[in-house]
Curated annotation (Swiss-Prot):
The protein's name in its UniProt record: Serine/threonine-protein phosphatase 4 regulatory subunit 3
Regions of compositional bias (Low complexity) in chain numbering: 709-749, 757-789, 803-859, 885-926
Region annotation (Disordered) ranges: 640-668, 695-861, 885-980
Family: Belongs to the SMEK family.
Assigned keywords, A-Z: Cytoplasm, Membrane, Nucleus
Localization annotation: Nucleus; Membrane; Cytoplasm
Lineage of producing organism: Eukaryota, Metazoa, Ecdysozoa, Arthropoda, Hexapoda
Gene name linked to the record: flfl
Presence of keyword Nucleus: yes
Acidic residues bias: start-end ranges: 953-968
Protein role: Regulatory subunit of serine/threonine-protein phosphatase 4. The probable PP4 complex Pp4-19C-PPP4R2r-flfl (PPP4C-PPP4R2-PPP4R3) is required to prevent caspase induced cell death (in vitro). May be involved in DNA damage repair. Key mediator specific for the localization of mira and associated cell fate determinants during both interphase and mitosis.
Subunit (UniProt): Serine/threonine-protein phosphatase 4 (PP4) occurs in different assemblies of the catalytic and one or more regulatory subunits. Probably part of a PP4 PPP4C-PPP4R2-PPP4R3 complex containing Pp4-19C, PPP4R2r and flfl. Interacts with mira.
């Protein structure tokens, strides 16, 4: 808390009208001012530092501290000032300084005694010892002196108390009333004017004991007579005539309790005095007049309610008359009016008393009685019945709900209390619709879910099953065609009330009102009212649609699109013809809400159907923004379609699968995830297409013809790719073995390297498949993984078809060399299905004569490209969201292939180029033993290469399990280990 904050104050000054004027905000300080010769309070303006206040702390000035943050004092006779502090600490600091100057204790609230307050403080001590007030003799000639004496006693509380005691003890009031009769008989106008002033001042004494005397049955009319002769009025009022003759007391059921009867009469007359005869309270606000009189009336009403509530016999008679079918309309009207006053008096009870009161009425059958009186044609009876129902519902809606639920099994649905109230609301014939508006308030309170407890679901089910049809009947009847059927003002007002209740239901009842609106197609009927000639009704229908859109419920949105419900709104906007009024602002706000909340369904629907109408509107940017947002949606969809449908020559194209939503409510979040996944997946697809294009260019038309002639294996989006891979790999392997004769002698290093890397790629794909199966068991499958399961199964089949032809060709080559190496041939046949044996056989079959070595190497390169592409795509599918793993595996396992730079590895290319030829290959005359030795060496190298490829994949997947293999010998294996 800083010093500036503590000392920040507002300065107030009291004006001539006794109102506080704000003189500015600033910071207060207490300092010695030489000019004033003392400690002064200085307030400087917060804005410019100008001096707002310079007030010397006077030793005899009364400073008062109020509410911990307010200091009030007077500068002179008629100039009051006040400082309102922002912080309590600052107020305490200034207050301590003031008390220090005046030598007072800072704990006091007032530094000096105030005259009026000092009299109050001394009143209790002086009340017994002070001399009584001597009133002049009660004579006709002394009326002026009596009036002046009473007027002079009103200045202090002590003198008021003494005067009250004198008036009460000496029966002075009755003596004055006797003089009133004398003056009235003599037509003594001056005396009557003095008596008016005397009794008006007696009311200002605010003493309940004097009220008891004046309001007694034998004196109250004389007091009213004295108050008729107001000097400011030329002719006296005739209050007594009204109370005695015009005011009629009607008893629907005779009251046998005389005390109760007297109390009712007294309360009515005193209420008349307060409301009609006495001046308005605003004139006497400073004297706090009429508070005791109001309390007198209040306690009278409480006593009346208690006495009636305790008289069970009387209440039974009242309700018997009310529910008796033979009771006349006049008597029933009087009974209802009596109950209305009874309920009005009960408003003065405490909450516990009110609860007991309404429970008593409910047990006696007040709600059953209201079912009869609400449908009466007499306006007074109906109005009083609605007032009673309003009082009950406002205090305890639970009572009415429980009663309504108990009526669910009643065969006469139309006679239910809630339906009766709705019918009376819709049938109100008054021009101002006072009854309809009052009943609308009752229905809203009953339908308010916040004040419902356990009966919420049951009552709403009851309402939407039995009552809502009655409520919306006028709307359905008036919207049969495409325009409102009845356009008179009375009907439009009633329809506006119905729309108000429906809007309330849309806002507070999510489930029930949604089902009702959608099943009955009611929203379309309501929007017919947008063509009404009454603007308030058009706004009511638009308000209902706006509340529905505010819910952002996709069920509502799809219903709006399906039924083209924006068309009436757009038509109303066009008919408004650009007039700047409430209707246009409301329509613009509706579309602005759609823009701000980014409601995609409605945005697309609006732009596709109505954007051309709003293209020329320049004074708001809402519609341009909606159009731009729509274009963004469309561009995104076009990119997705282009990705799915693109073609490149005769090569197969990978198609991304469709996106599946688990829940419509998660549309926006999953839409963004879908686009992110599509972007990553597209990169892998492009890489594959580039590789396949390079393979096609290198192999020429022969490979393409083989691809075209291969039958499809699946209807999967990826079946074209898999068939092409199988055909390319099979044909390449066959060409390699058939184009180069098998020899047991030396082999080409380039062919050996190509075969080794081809087999490593095949085993890399197998390892990727195994890794994917483990991931499926360890984690839940996301929607994208579930989508790619059929493609993964297809990959397994296609990889088997890639490996099988190669194994068959390799076995044939191995059998040709069986005479030279029976041991190697046997091992290759036994392990033809394993990755390591396939690698060994490939190495043996690759030994050929120098003339065919270049062709074999070229074809092996093509097979390697196809195998690498297969392994790359398989690892992409298997890891789904881990593209980095796929890229690393492809980089480590691919050989140097110039037609496919996206998957080549320069390091491996250099390593293969530097490999020295084996000793057996350089010998011109080698025997069977040398051939076997060469074959064994090649097999070991191939095993190492295959194992390295598998280990590299696992290492990239995050498992640090690479170790030096015992077979990893020789410069080639060591070089590959370092590269891994």
């Amino acid at each position: 808390m800083t010093t500036d904050t503590r000392r920040r104050v507002k300065l107030y000054a009291l004006n001539a009208e006794r109102q506080w004027d704000d003189r500015g905000t600033g910071h207060v300080s207490s300092t010695y001012v030489e000019r004033l010769k003392g400690i002064s309070l200085l307030v400087r303006a917060e804005s410019d530092g100008s001096l707002l206040l310079e007030s010397k702390i006077q030793p005899d000035t009364a400073y008062q501290k109020q509410q911990d943050t307010l200091i009030v004092w007077s500068e002179g006779d008629n100039f009051d000032l006040a400082l309102s502090f922002q912080e309590k600490a600052g107020c305490d600091e200034i207050w301590e300084k003031i008390c220090q100057v005046q030598g007072k204790d800072p704990s006091v609230e007032i530094t000096q005694d105030i005259v009026e307050e000092s009299e109050d403080e001394r009143f209790e001590d002086m009340s017994d010892t002070a001399p009584p007030i001597e009133l002049p003799p009660c004579e006709l000639s002394r009326l002026e002196d009596i009036s002046e004496t009473i007027q002079s006693c009103l200045s202090t509380p002590l003198r008021k108390e003494k005067l009250s005691m004198a008036l009460e003890s000496e029966s002075y009031i009755k003596k004055l009333l006797n003089l009133f009769h004398v003056c009235e008989d003599l037509d003594n106008t001056e005396g009557l004017h003095h008596l008016f002033e005397i009794f008006k001042n007696i009311f200002l004494l605010n003493k309940n004991a004097l009220f008891e005397i004046m309001f007694a049955d034998d004196t109250i009319f004389d007091v009213v007579g004295c108050l008729e002769y107001d000097p400011s009025v030329s002719q006296p009022k005739k209050h007594r005539q009204y109370l005695k003759q015009l005011a009629k007391f009607r008893e629907a059921v005779p009251i046998k309790n005389l005390d109760l009867l007297a109390k009712i009469h007294q309360t009515f007359r005193v209420q008349y005095i307060q409301d009609i005869i006495l001046p308005t309270p605003s004139v006497f606000v400073e004297d706090n007049m009429l508070n005791t009189l109001s309390s007198f009336i209040f306690f009278n009403k409480v006593e009346i309610v208690t006495m009636i509530q305790d008289d069970e016999r009387y209440l039974l008679d009242v309700f018997a008359v009310l529910t008796d079918p033979t009771t006349g309309d006049a008597k029933r009207r009087d009974t209802v009016l009596f109950l209305k006053e009874f309920c009005n008096y009960a408003q003065n009870l405490q909450p516990q008393g009110k609860d007991s009161f309404y429970k008593t009425l409910t047990c006696l059958g007040i709600l059953q009685a209201l079912e009869l009186t609400l449908v009466m044609n007499d306006k007074k009876t109906k109005s009083a019945s609605i007032d009673i129902l309003t009082a009950i519902v406002e205090f305890s809606p639970l009572v009415v709900r429980n009663y309504t639920l108990n009526q669910a099994n009643r065969p006469e649905v139309e006679r239910m209390l809630l339906n009766i109230a709705i019918e009376q609301m819709l049938n109100d014939s008054e021009p101002e619709l006072g009854i309809a508006v009052q009943l609308m308030g009752i229905v809203k309170i009953l339908l308010e879910p916040e004040n419902m407890l356990t009966e919420k679901g049951d009552f709403l089910n009851f309402f939407y099953k039995y009552s809502v049809q009655t409520l919306v009947a006028p709307v359905i009847l008036n919207t049969i065609g495409d325009r409102p059927q009845n356009e008179d003002y009375q009907t439009a007002q009633l329809l506006g009330i119905v729309l108000d209740i429906l809007s309330f239901c849309v806002e507070h009842h999510s489930y029930h009102i949604k089902n009702f609106l959608l099943q009955k197609d009611l929203l379309k009927r309501i929007l017919v009212l947008m063509k009404s000639t009454h603007t308030f009704l058009v706004l009511g229908a638009l308000r209902l649609l706006r509340k529905i859109i505010a819910l952002k419920d996709e069920f509502y949105n799809r219903h709006i699109v399906k039924c083209n419900l924006f068309a009436p709104v757009v038509d109303a906007f066009i008919r408004n013809n650009g007039r700047y009024n409430l209707l246009e602002s409301a329509i613009l706000e509706l579309f602005e809400f759609i823009k701000l909340e980014d409601i995609r369904t409605l945005c697309v629907y609006f732009v596709e159907n109505f954007s051309k109408i709003f293209d020329e509107i320049e004074y708001v940017q809402t519609f341009k923004y909606l159009k731009n947002r729509y274009d963004q949606y469309q561009d995104r969809l076009k990119d997705r379609d282009k990705m799915e449908n693109r073609t490149d020559g005769g090569l197969p194209i990978i198609r991304s699968g469709g996106r599946f939503r688990r829940d419509q409510r998660q549309m926006e979040e999953e839409e963004e995830m879908w686009f992110n996944e599509e972007d990553d997946f597209t990169e892998e697809i492009d890489t594959y297409n580039n590789v396949m294009k390079s393979v096609s260019e290198k192999n020429g038309p022969q490979t393409q013809n083989q691809q075209k002639s291969s039958p499809p294996h699946s209807t999967s989006p990826h079946s074209g790719l898999l068939g092409s891979l199988s055909t390319t790999a099979s044909s390449t392997a066959t060409s390699a073995t058939s184009g180069a004769p098998v020899a047991s002698g030396s082999s080409s290093p380039e062919a050996i390297s190509a075969d080794e890397q081809t087999q490593a790629a095949v085993h890399l794909a197998a390892a990727a498949l195994q890794h994917h199966q483990q991931q499926q068991q360890q984690q839940q499958q996301n929607p994208f993984q579930q989508q790619t399961q059929p493609e993964i199964a297809e990959l397994q089949q296609q990889l088997s078809s890639v490996e099988a032809p190669q194994s068959q060709e390799l076995e044939l080559s191995q059998s040709a060399a069986a005479s030279a190496s029976p041991t190697s041939s046997s091992s290759s046949l036994e392990a033809s299905t394993s990755s390591s044996s396939a690698s060994s056989s490939s190495s043996s079959s690759s030994s050929s004569s120098p003339p065919g070595s270049s062709a074999a190497a070229s074809l092996c390169d093509s097979a390697t490209v196809a195998a690498v592409a297969a392994s790359q795509f398989l690892s992409t599918i298997a890891t789904a969201m881990a593209a980095s793993v796929t890229a690393a595996a492809a980089t480590n396992s691919s050989p140097s292939i110039s037609p496919a730079p996206a998957v080549s590895s320069p390091d491996i290319e250099n390593a293969d180029a530097q490999l020295p030829p084996s000793d057996d290959a350089s010998s011109p005359a080698s025997g069977e033993q040398d051939a076997n030795s060469t074959e064994g060496t090649s097999s070991e190298a191939d095993k190492t290469t295959a194992k390295k490829g598998l280990v590299d994949y696992e290492s990239d997947s995050g498992e640090d399990d690479y170790e030096e293999d015992e077979y990893s010998e020789g410069p080639q294996a060591q070089k590959r280990a370092r590269q891994a």
